[in-house]
């Protein structure tokens, strides 16, 4: 029996989603595999985990530009060294888990898990394969620390593979599989049934609007953009998802009522029906987290990017814009003009959908698991 640990960390939801997709795929498609899913930071030190995840979310929410500076400064120099040294110290606790479980493979969807395991391998306390699964569309050097002890790097696209190779990672270690994706986004759904269940019309184009966000970024800007969509007269209907942000849900509902658009706008809080909703949508409006981006591309959906967190999400937005699958609404853009241009230009929408499907790596999770388990 093979033993696998998949580590993630709770700095944003994407690392857990990617880790869970790998675990679910292996459990569904492989026999004789014992696989565990563990939050590495929560496991090694609950207090450190609480302090650092709270600091990350508060910075991203309240002072995003400051977070952007941290992101770039942690590529190298003192900040990068502090992070690496901290993970070396924290690895002592992780070592006990690894010694008890004796995994054949350790997978990490966050650089901290990779650093801890690579350091233990360097110290000859760990003797197994280490795999890193990168969950954005541009590399950050934190992923590459102690890379000589890492066996696999799974990245989102070929250009990223070239970038890692230029940073000294051997080509044979790098696989452009794409970011792990839940199988739910690959299923075929009965569109008429889904439209009916959400009270939506088959005669209108559907916009899926992710407006809450994990960190409630850019409230006033989000509401301004949302209002422009709600007021738009291009025969559209909107499903707005506020996530766990109750205040944003109230703001959405108030705006919809004020504009008397209840028939054309549905406001939801957290929902597990995102795969179904994407299957009936024509456009996604979202901040460009790695996982939401991956899911949108897999469903062949053009993306309107709003409120990217400085750092990784701005890099994701740049990648999407460069590949002509997204329109990035920036600070002083005329949102109404952008929307009218988009909805009145069906050729442009079709081309964006085609490019999204071409850019997507829908078999990402399957391909990662095949490489890890040497099928």
Language-model regions, residue ranges each:
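Active-site and donor-binding regions of nucleotide-sugar-utilizing enzymes
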Residues: 69-168, 173-176
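Acidic donor-binding loop of glycosyltransferase active sites
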Residues: 279-288
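C-terminal "capping" alpha-helix adjacent to the active site of nucleotide-linked donor transferases
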Residues: 331-348
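A short, well-ordered alpha-helix in the C-terminal region of glycosyltransferases
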Residues: 348-362
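C-terminal alpha-helical cap of glycosyltransferases
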Residues: 362-375
């Amino acid at each position: 029996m093979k033993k696998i640990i998949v580590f993630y960390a709770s700095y944003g939801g994407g690392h857990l989603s990617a880790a869970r997709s790998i675990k679910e795929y292996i459990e569904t498609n492989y026999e004789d595999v014992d696989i565990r899913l563990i939050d590495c930071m929560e496991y090694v030190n609950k207090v450190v985990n609480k302090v650092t995840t709270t600091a990350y979310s508060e910075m991203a929410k309240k002072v995003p530009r400051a977070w952007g500076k941290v992101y770039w400064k942690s590529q190298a120099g003192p900040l990068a060294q502090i992070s690496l040294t901290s993970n070396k110290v924290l690895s002592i606790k992780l070592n006990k888990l690894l010694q008890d479980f004796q995994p054949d493979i350790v997978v990490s969807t966050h650089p901290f898990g990779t650093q801890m395991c690579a350091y233990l391998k360097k110290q000859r306390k760990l003797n197994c394969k280490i795999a890193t699964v990168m969950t954005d569309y541009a590399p950050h050097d934190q992923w590459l620390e102690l890379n000589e002890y890492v066996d696999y790097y799974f990245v989102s696209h070929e250009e990223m593979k070239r970038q890692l190779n230029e940073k000294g990672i051997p080509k044979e270690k790098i696989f452009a599989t794409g970011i792990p994706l839940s199988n739910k986004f690959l299923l075929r759904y009965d569109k008429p049934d889904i439209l009916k269940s959400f009270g939506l019309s088959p005669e209108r184009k559907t916009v899926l609007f992710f407006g809450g966000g994990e960190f409630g970024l850019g409230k006033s800007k989000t509401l301004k953009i949302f209002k422009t969509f709600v007021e738009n007269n291009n025969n559209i209907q909107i499903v707005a998802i506020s996530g766990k942000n109750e205040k944003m849900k109230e703001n959405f509902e108030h705006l919809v009522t004020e504009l008397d658009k209840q028939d054309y706008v549905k406001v939801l809080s957290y929902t597990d029906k995102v795969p179904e909703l994407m299957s009936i949508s024509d456009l996604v409006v979202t901040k460009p987290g790695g996982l939401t981006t991956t899911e949108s591309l897999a469903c062949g959906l053009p993306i309107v990017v709003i409120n990217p967190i400085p750092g990784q999400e701005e890099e994701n937005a740049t990648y999407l814009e460069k590949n002509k699958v997204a329109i990035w609404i920036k600070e002083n853009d005329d949102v109404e003009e952008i929307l009218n241009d988009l909805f009145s230009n069906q050729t442009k929408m079709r081309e964006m959908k085609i490019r999204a499907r071409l850019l997507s790596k829908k078999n990402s999770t399957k391909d990662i698991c095949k490489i890890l388990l040497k099928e």
